A protein has these predicted regions:
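"…centered on the first transmembrane helix and the immediately adjacent amphipathic helix/loop
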Residues: 1-73
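Membrane-interfacial alpha-helical segments at the cytosolic side of multi-pass membrane proteins
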Residues: 75-88, 133-147
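Membrane-interface loop-to-helix entry segments
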Residues: 64-78, 125-133
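Membrane-helix interface segments
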Residues: 2-4, 91-99, 121-125
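Interfacial helix-loop-helix junctions of multi-pass membrane proteins
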Residues: 108-129
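Membrane interface segments of multi-pass transport proteins and intramembrane proteases
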Residues: 41, 45, 87-92, 146-149
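Membrane-water interface at transmembrane helix exits
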Residues: 18, 70, 83-87, 111, ...
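Small-polar-interrupted transmembrane alpha-helices in polytopic inner-membrane proteins
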Residues: 12-13, 96-115
Length: 149
């Protein structure tokens, strides 16, 4: 079972690396694609059409928040997986919490350093904080569940 847990952590880290390895234009287009699909789904549900100009305005307003929420989500899941893995070592609650956070913080820093070498991308300390917000949420939620069992 530990092998599967390690595998899931590694796969998730590779996924984060993959997204970080995208040139800025590709990354931006991926975010815009998510926004357009979401808007299209909502407009179908509420049966309302929007103009191209309105769509562009919505994309402009929502692209950055969508990208930051993606950071939170990716590191939230990473923290869940890392914490789940560490729990299999029967560590104390405080050790699980500390090691999970440390692993996520280190990976977040390495991810931002990696982006310095990608076309059109830059490393951002703000993104490290945003990533780690997701990490803290993930560790907090799973550890709360661990404590209650």
């Amino acid at each position: 079972m530990k092998f599967i847990k390690y595998l899931l952590v590694i796969i998730w880290m590779i996924l984060i690396f993959y997204f970080s390895n995208q040139p800025a234009n590709n990354s931006s287009n991926q975010s815009k694609g998510v926004i357009i699909k979401s808007i299209t789904a909502v407009t179908k549900i509420v049966n309302k059409n929007i103009s191209e100009k309105e769509l562009e305005k919505i994309i402009y307003i929502t692209e950055k928040p969508v990208r930051k929420l993606a950071h939170i989500f990716l590191y939230f899941v990473l923290a869940l997986l890392v914490t789940w893995l560490l729990k299999s070592y029967n560590l104390e609650y405080n050790q699980i919490f500390l090691y999970s956070i440390m692993i996520c913080i280190l990976y977040s820093f390495s991810d931002e350093i990696h982006q310095l070498f990608i076309s059109g991308r830059s490393g951002s300390i703000i993104d490290v904080f945003i990533d780690n917000l997701g990490s803290y949420l993930g560790v907090f939620i799973i550890n709360k569940r661990i404590k209650s069992t």
